[in-house]
Structure formats: structure tokens, C-alpha cells
């Protein structure tokens, strides 16, 4: 996030009128993790498919139309997708034709993975020149109607969405040797990634064999389009519509050989960083209106001195027995640095967990000198003495506390282990992604990687895998720097008094750097204003002031999307909010409203399912083939899974150890045939290459030499190198300890104050235009840290930033705001 601190704080000029250089704020720290707009696999929206890829190697063969035995009765022949993209929605019409090779009546099952931002709003099934259209009914009625129809020899389809996000429906009594065509309408929220809007069809949606495929995408945006790209498939055709000011375009692609990679369309529009975009959709079906608003602000014009935002920081530290020794020492040191990097606009707290958990405060407290001293005392007592690794109880304690949208909650989790019921834990935190962003650190080689990645991705955060303790603090501070980047929080849409709306989502997640806001709303009545309506997007800006972005809704320019995509996604998000209220046990009965929305817009929900039934013209007399469905392996991680992972890790470690031991063994066998001089040369040469973990083994083998002089020299060289390495490490540790001592003396406001005893400061050299000893002391300490610890810059970036900001505030108070650079240069002469 910061440029080189020496470039920031020092100017080439030494005159008293020097203007200090400030650091522009950007999302460069985030881009180190997610790359550019083409790195779609690092985008938040792709996490659902990432989980599919990691868990199920064979899933690709289970999607589509199958029999319950998962055999090759049905085969996809033709597949066409017609999509339309606007600012906030993507509507896709699927047409799939399957051949049916069964010689007897068969019951099939159709499944596809459905991302959490997508909904099925309609489906039909065709065979024998008949068309069966799905209708939404209450879940109980749909199930009963399906069972009755099948029992009487009729055709029936029952569709539901499973808990793991798969849309599926059973098709009963399909006649033999009759082709089947399935039509789906899928409406998705557009997938924003950095400055782009994306549309992704994962390869798991397509069978792993050849079929005819056609993809047509129609793009209609409210802003001009800069670029359009289709990854992996260069033989696509892109055309911009004439007289559309580059706001409309089409993309087409076809294949005779099926699909072997993800289909990812990336559209980059021009960005209006000051004005949210809006769409007003009119539904001809029932003469209603829906609105969507999207906004991707940029704060790149701000400097680090401008940022003065509120936030809540909670740190959850693994204190199980496996963290003993160097890991817990490093964690404590990192915590001491982090808590000095916070500012007085923050709330903060620390949790320690193992078989049980403790916390510094009952609830997060405001950051000041008193609470900083209290929590620093808590950190000093932290040790790896809490037993096992039970992560769910402390996370539940944190997330069950209602978040304050004025202080966006950011949770940092540091662990080196595994947990039981991992996937249940990840699914739980995902339900709180609207109010909490999670950063995770995985320590060492035995940590459950999917736990670390899954927790962060579920809450749109970031993660670090820390394999080497030597870079511990640096890697920790990388994520902390991201947490400090500009944020728009406490966001609300002021719809004014003319519009009666129902908004989804009701509570808007804080808008972090590089993210896009999307909000939907249904107008509650059909009466609309004759003219434009002014509404506004309001939030707390990164400078600490309220920001307001005007939005003009012009009802003379409504759009009639054929599939009511804006209406549908508005209803979908409202249903999610209502279901979430019930999940949290607020004793609200929202069933009637959920069923009403589900039936109006064709949405599967907690209380609604799709059902299609039709009486057969000829009742099927043969026995319908009934086959056992292949059981999908459970997605829940259990203790046995953890044990298996440990066994695999132990096996790998043992094999590596044996392999290296064999290398050393072979070395000394070959040395038996060499002269003493050759032995000296060969042993010393190879010693430098072997892993340090084998040092004792090497010493043992070297003792087998027939010559005591050779043995003594080899062991002596070995010991000298070990001693040299220890001295080097001790030097680094001592340097780090002295830096930490300086950092721990910093006050909550960023200053270092008198009396200061860490090193001698001559207060008599303080310039006359400075009225406070603390200003002079702080300037000198800044110089001291920059000068003495250049290799540890990433650790103290935020600490120095806070200190310099405090000094500049004091200089502004003294009416000398432009003298920061010259005073810093002067103070450098006195360190």
C-alpha cells in the first residue's frame, strides 16, 4: 500500500518551506493477491466453483441428465446458451437436447451446480412433442403432487435446490428411446472483479465429451465498453452495435467438440467513480417496476494522510499446544506490531482459542492509551497452553454479536492446525459475509489449507500461508495493510418520500477497495412519478466524513427486459434477507411473503419448489426402471479426515527424511575409498547442501571415518557453521527485539512522548517553532526506525504512517503544515 517510506518522508530539498510528499492510496496490495481482471479464479464470485473443483474430482460426470445409476442412458447432443448482460444482471436461456438410449421406461435426474448469486426462474421439459412447464408451489404441495402423479402412471418433475447449491429435479416415467429437451432460464447477479463485469460458465456444467455448442451474449450497459474478451476460446466473434456509443455489443462462439475449459466473458466498462449507475425495469406482465443500482468508487486520489476511517479489528489466535515455541513467539510479536498500527477511530479485541477460548475484553473497545496498555498486557501473557483446536466456539461468539456498520468488522484468524466439521464452519461464516470480512493465516506445513482459504474466501477476505517463520511478521502485515485501504461503510440508499420500495439486500455490506456495490429494489405499488426522482447513495467515506452520491431515476426511460431479470434478482435478494431473519431465530414468520415472491418470480426457496405434472395419454404398463443413486461423498470434514491428513503428512515427511538419510549414507560409503584429503573436501562440500534437520545424522556418519583427524576437521567445520548460523539468527532476533521495544513505546495517537529513555534525545536541539517535546521526539524516533531497520520496513510501515500523520496534524495546529519534510530532515541529524 505504501511506497518506500524513505521516499515518502524525505525530500531532496532542505529549505524550511519544503512540502512533504504523501503516499497515494491504491488497491495495489489487493492486486498482489488477485492480479488483473483476467485472474478470474481469484475473484470472489469464483469461490463456489473453487470449492467444487477441490472436493469432487468426478463431479463433471454427474451433472446434466442422468439415470439414478449414473450410466450413459442419456447423452447431450446439442447445447445452446443465449445470454443478456446489463450493469447488474445476466439472463441465460439454456436449451439442451439429450438422446435417450433406454429400452424401457426410466426415471432420470437432472443436476447442475448453481452459484449462490444465481437463480432458476423457469424451466420446461419436452419429449414426444409435448411441453411440460414448471410452476412454483409450496414445497409440501409440490412433493405430494409429484408422488400422486408417479403412482398413477403420469409424468412428473419435481425441482429443488440442495443445501450445497445444486439445482436438481427428478423426471419420472420417461418413455423409452425418446429424446428429451430441457430449457432453463437462469438469472444471475453480474460478477464484478476489479474494474470488470464477468460472466462465467464453469467447465463442470458441460459433459466431458463432444457435442454441438453455441453461445450468444448480448451486452447492454449504461456506460461505454472499453474491452470485451472471451478467455480460452479465440475463435469468438465480437461486434459493437452501431449508434450505441459503444454501450452495446454482441459476442458469439460455437464449437463442434464440446467444452474443455471454463467459458469466461470479461467486459470492462468505462467507470464513473462519482456517479452510481441505475436501471429501471418495467414488467409488462403485471405492470410493476424494479430498480437496480451499481457503483464502483475509486479512492486513488486520496493519500495515506487523508484516510481516517472507522473499523473494528478482532484477532483470533491459535493457542493450542502445537503452536508452542517459535510460532507463538512470532504471533505475539506480530500482535504487538499490529495493535500499534491501529488508530483512535478503531475498536479492537483479541481472542485466544484452543480447547476453550479467552478474550481480552468482553466486547470490542475503542482504541486509546488505556485500552492499548490493557491489551498489550494480555498479549504478554499469551502462551500455547489451551489444548486442542476448537475454532467454532470463538467464531460463533464473535459473529453472534451484532456488527456495527459504522465500524466495519474485520476478523484476523491465525492457526496452524485442523478442525473437525471444517465445511460446516466455513458454511456458517459465509452466512455472515455481509457484515464481517475475514483474513486468515495458515502457519507451518501441517495446517489445513482448505480451512485457511475457505474461511477467507467465504467472507471475501484474503489469506497467507506462512511456511517460514523468518518472514512471519512481514506476511502478517501484508494482510493488515489491505485492511487499512479506503472503505465506504455504513451504506444506505435514501429513496426519498415519493417511492415506496422493498430493498434487497436490506443491509449493505461495506464497500472495500476494488469492490462493486449492487442493490435491488421492488416498487411496492404501480404508481410512479411523472418526472424524474432524485435518490442518493450515502455512506461514511474513508476520510471520516459522510459521502453522498446522487442518483437520478428517470421513469420515462424504463427498460422492458423479457425475463424480468431486475425484478427476479430483487425478489431473490429480499427472500434471502427474510430467510436469514428466520435462521437467526428472530421469531419472525416470513413464510407468506417468501411464498408470494417465490410464486410471482418463479423462485425456489425454503418454502417453495418447482413441480410439473401431466396425465399420460397412455399409462405406462411396464415396470419403470428404478436404480440406486450413487452416493456423493460427504462434504463434512471429520476427525478421521484430520487423522488421514496427518498420516499423509507424516508419510511424506518420513519418506523425505529417509531419502536424505540415504544420500548421506551413500556419501560416506563412497568416502571409504578416498584419501584423507579427498574425504575432507568431499564431506565439507556435501555438508553445505544437506538439510539442517539432518545435522545430527551427518555428525554421526562423519564419526564413522577411519581417520580421527578427518573426523575432527569435518565436525569442527560443521560446528563452526552451526555457530555462525546461530550468531546470524541471534543478530536478527536482537535487531527485531530492539525495534519492537521502540514500537511498544508508541502512544495510541501515534506519538512518542517525554520522558523517553530508550536512547538519548537532545531536546535542546528542538527547533523554536515547535512547542511540544513530543513532536521532536516523534520525528527523531521516525528517523531512528527508518535508519536502523531498513530490512524490516514492511513491519513498521503502518506504525510510521500513524506517527507521521500525528506530527503533520500538530504542525497544522502550529500553522506550519508545509514544514514536515524539512523538520524530518533536520531531526535526522540528531539521531
Curated annotation (Swiss-Prot):
Pfam families for the chain: VIT, VWA_3
InterPro entries in alphabetical order: VIT, VWF_A, vWFA_dom_sf
Boundaries of every VWFA domain copy: 312-480
Domain VIT: 60-188
Source species, domain of life: Eukaryota
PANTHER family given in the database record: VON WILLEBRAND FACTOR A DOMAIN-CONTAINING PROTEIN 5A, VON WILLEBRAND FACTOR A DOMAIN-CONTAINING PROTEIN DDB_G0267758-RELATED
Name of the protein: von Willebrand factor A domain-containing protein DDB_G0285981
Organism for this UniProt entry: Dictyostelium discoideum
Amino acid at each position: 500500500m505504501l511506497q518506500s517510506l524513505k521516499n515518502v518522508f524525505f525530500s531532496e530539498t532542505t529549505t524550511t518551506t519544503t512540502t512533504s510528499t504523501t503516499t497515494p492510496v491504491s488497491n495495489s496490495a489487493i492486486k498482489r493477491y488477485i492480479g488483473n481482471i483476467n485472474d478470474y479464479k481469484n475473484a470472489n464470485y469464483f469461490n463456489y466453483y473453487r470449492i467444487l473443483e477441490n472436493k469432487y474430482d468426478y463431479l463433471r460426470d454427474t451433472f446434466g441428465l442422468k439415470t439414478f445409476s449414473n450410466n450413459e442412458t442419456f447423452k447431450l447432443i446439442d447445447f445452446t446458451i443465449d445470454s443478456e448482460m446489463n450493469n447488474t444482471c445476466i439472463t441465460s436461456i439454456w436449451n439442451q437436447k439429450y438422446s435417450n438410449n433406454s429400452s424401457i421406461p426410466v426415471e432420470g435426474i437432472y443436476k447442475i451446480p448453481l452459484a449462490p448469486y444465481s437463480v432458476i426462474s423457469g424451466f420446461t421439459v419436452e419429449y414426444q412433442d409435448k411441453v411440460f412447464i414448471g410452476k412454483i408451489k409450496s414445497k409440501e404441495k409440490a412433493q405430494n403432487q409429484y408422488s400422486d402423479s408417479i403412482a398413477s402412471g403420469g409424468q412428473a418433475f419435481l425441482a429443488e435446490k440442495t443445501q450445497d447449491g445444486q439445482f436438481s429435479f427428478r423426471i419420472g416415467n420417461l418413455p423409452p428411446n425418446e429424446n428429451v429437451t430441457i430449457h432453463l432460464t437462469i438469472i444471475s447477479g453480474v460478477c464484478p472483479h476489479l474494474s470488470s463485469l464477468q460472466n462465467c460458465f464453469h467447465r463442470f456444467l458441460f459433459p466431458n465429451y463432444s457435442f454441438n455448442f453455441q453461445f450468444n451474449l448480448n451486452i447492454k450497459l449504461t456506460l461505454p465498453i472499453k474491452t470485451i474478451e472471451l478467455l480460452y476460446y479465440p475463435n469468438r466473434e465480437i461486434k459493437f452495435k452501431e449508434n450505441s456509443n459503444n454501450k452495446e455489443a454482441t459476442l458469439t462462439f460455437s464449437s463442434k467438440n464440446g467444452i474443455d475449459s471454463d467459458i469466461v466473458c470479461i467486459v470492462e466498462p468505462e467507470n464513473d467513480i462519482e456517479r452510481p449507475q441505475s436501471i429501471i425495469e418495467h414488467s409488462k406482465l403485471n405492470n410493476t417496476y424494479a430498480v437496480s443500482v451499481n457503483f464502483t468508487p475509486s479512492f486513488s486520489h486520496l493519500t495515506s494522510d487523508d484516510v481516517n476511517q472507522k473499523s473494528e479489528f478482532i484477532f483470533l489466535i491459535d493457542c493450542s499446544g502445537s503452536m508452542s515455541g517459535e510460532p507463538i513467539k512470532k504471533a505475539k510479536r506480530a500482535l504487538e506490531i499490529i495493535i500499534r498500527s491501529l488508530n483512535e477511530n478503531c475498536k479492537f479485541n483479541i481472542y485466544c482459542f484452543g480447547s476453550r477460548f479467552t478474550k481480552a475484553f468482553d466486547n470490542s473497545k475503542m482504541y486509546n492509551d488505556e485500552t492499548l496498555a490493557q491489551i498489550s498486557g494480555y498479549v504478554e501473557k499469551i502462551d500455547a497452553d489451551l489444548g486442542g483446536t476448537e475454532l467454532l466456539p470463538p467464531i460463533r461468539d464473535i459473529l453472534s454479536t451484532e456488527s456495527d456498520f459504522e465500524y466495519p468488522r474485520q476478523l484476523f484468524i491465525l492457526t496452524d492446525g485442523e478442525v473437525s466439521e471444517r465445511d460446516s464452519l466455513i458454511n456458517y461464516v459465509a452466512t455472515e459475509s455481509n457484515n464481517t470480512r475475514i483474513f486468515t493465516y495458515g502457519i507451518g506445513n501441517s495446517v489445513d489449507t482448505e480451512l485457511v482459504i475457505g474461511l477467507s474466501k467465504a467472507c471475501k477476505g484474503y489469506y497467507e500461508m506462512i511456511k517460514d517463520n523468518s518472514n512471519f511478521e512481514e506476511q502478517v502485515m501484508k494482510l493488515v495493510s489491505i485492511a487499512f485501504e479506503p472503505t465506504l461503510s455504513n451504506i444506505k440508499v435514501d429513496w426519498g418520500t415519493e417511492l415506496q420500495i422493498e430493498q434487497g439486500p436490506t443491509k449493505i455490506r461495506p464497500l472495500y477497495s476494488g469492490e462493486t456495490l449492487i442493490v435491488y429494489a421492488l416498487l411496492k405499488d404501480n404508481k410512479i412519478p411523472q418526472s424524474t426522482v432524485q435518490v442518493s447513495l450515502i455512506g461514511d467515506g474513508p476520510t471520516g466524513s459522510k459521502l453522498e452520491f446522487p442518483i437520478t431515476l428517470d421513469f420515462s426511460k424504463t427498460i422492458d427486459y423479457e425475463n424480468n431479470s431486475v425484478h427476479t434478482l430483487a425478489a431473490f435478494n429480499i427472500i434471502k434477507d427474510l430467510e436469514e431473519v428466520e435462521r437467526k431465530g428472530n421469531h419472525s414468520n416470513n413464510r407468506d411473503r417468501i411464498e408470494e415472491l417465490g410464486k410471482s418470480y418463479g423462485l425456489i426457496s425454503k418454502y417453495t419448489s418447482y413441480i410439473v405434472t401431466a396425465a399420460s395419454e397412455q399409462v405406462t404398463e411396464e415396470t419403470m426402471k428404478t436404480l440406486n443413486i450413487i452416493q456423493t461423498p460427504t462434504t463434512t470434514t471429520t476427525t478421521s479426515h484430520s487423522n488421514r491428513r496427518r498420516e499423509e503428512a507424516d508419510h511424506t515427511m518420513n519418506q523425505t527424511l529417509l531419502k536424505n538419510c540415504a544420500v548421506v549414507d551413500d556419501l560416506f560409503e563412497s568416502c571409504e575409498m578416498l584419501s584423507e584429503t579427498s574425504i575432507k573436501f568431499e564431506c565439507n562440500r556435501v555438508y553445505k547442501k544437506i538439510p539442517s534437520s539432518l545435522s545430527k545424522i551427518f555428525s554421526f556418519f562423519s564419526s564413522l571415518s577411519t581417520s580421527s583427524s578427518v573426523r575432527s576437521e569435518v565436525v569442527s567445520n560443521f560446528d563452526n557453521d552451526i555457530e555462525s548460523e546461530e550468531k546470524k539468527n541471534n543478530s536478527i532476533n536482537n535487531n527485531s527485539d530492539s525495534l519492537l521495544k521502540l514500537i511498544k513505546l508508541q502512544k495510541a495517537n501515534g506519538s512518542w512522548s517525554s520522558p523517553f529513555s530508550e536512547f538519548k534525545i537532545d531536546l535542546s536541539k528542538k527547533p523554536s517553532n515547535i512547542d511540544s517535546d513530543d513532536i521532536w521526539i516523534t520525528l527523531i524516533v521516525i528517523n531512528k526506525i527508518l535508519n536502523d531497520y531498513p530490512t524490516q520496513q514492511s513491519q513498521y510501515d503502518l506504525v510510521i504512517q500513524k506517527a507521521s500523520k500525528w506530527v503533520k496534524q500538530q504542525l497544522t495546529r502550529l500553522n506550519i503544515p508545509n514544514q514536515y519534510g524539512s523538520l524530518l530532515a533536520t531531526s535526522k541529524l540528531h539521531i
